[in-house]
Amino acid sequence: MKTKIISLFFVLVLTLSACGSGFAFQRNLDKWEAQNIGHYQFTVAVSCFCPFANVEVTYEVLNGQVVNQSIQSSPDNPVDEAQVSDFYQSYNTIEKVFDYVGDAINKADETNIEYDPTYGFPTNITVDWIKLAVDDEMYLTLSNFEPLS
């Protein structure tokens, strides 16, 4: 009996934590969409066990389309800009970042998402797709957000 109660408790905690992630996601997506910001720029950095870890890319977005990008890498670690653009394509607009986060919340074993308190977009994203796997974690950081006129 005690084992069943403990098991039920853990199921309830996991269910509520998943709902909390989904609720925070929807609340912040609604906040972002209510801002109706059609022209903005931001910087994204991805950290993972991948070829372009720790490369920062700044995007200018106009009406959902990337109109400018700037790739920052160190001189001792040059990168192929076309490959970086392709790799970062899923994160090159705030809307795509929300798509990525929504997918991660629904499919990954573990997520931790922090949101900008003013605009609602995700700022720090940690995704562990398979908890027991090694080197599948993804970390995204969005910074330097600026609405443009």
Predicted regions and their residues:
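Bacterial signal peptide processing site
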Residues: 20-22
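Mature extracytoplasmic domains of secretory-pathway proteins
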Residues: 63-111
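Short, surface-exposed coil-to-beta transition loops
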Residues: 52-57, 135-140
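C-terminal motif of bacterial Sec signal peptides marking the signal peptidase cleavage site
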Residues: 15-18
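A short, structured loop/turn motif at beta-sheet edges
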Residues: 33, 60-67, 117-118
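Bacterial N-terminal signal peptides that target proteins for export
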Residues: 1-8
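Short, structured surface segments that line ligand/substrate-binding pockets
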Residues: 98-133
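A short, Trp-centered hydrophobic/proline-enriched beta-strand micro-motif
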Residues: 35-46
